[in-house]
């Protein structure tokens, strides 16, 4: 399992990809890494930061947020 960033104090996992749409392999790789994480680490929030895509992906552990970079930056 590999994620781009994990912030233990916030229990936040982040994947970064320019785009996850249009490529089944890219989306699968980015999402699967975040889906496996809660099995080994405590994780309250899972995020994929993209250039301009936005959606939510639900799984057995809750939601994975897909958000554009600009939106993630103004939230911080």
Where are these regions (language model features)?
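A cross-kingdom feature that marks ATP-driven nucleic-acid transaction machinery
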Residues: 1-76
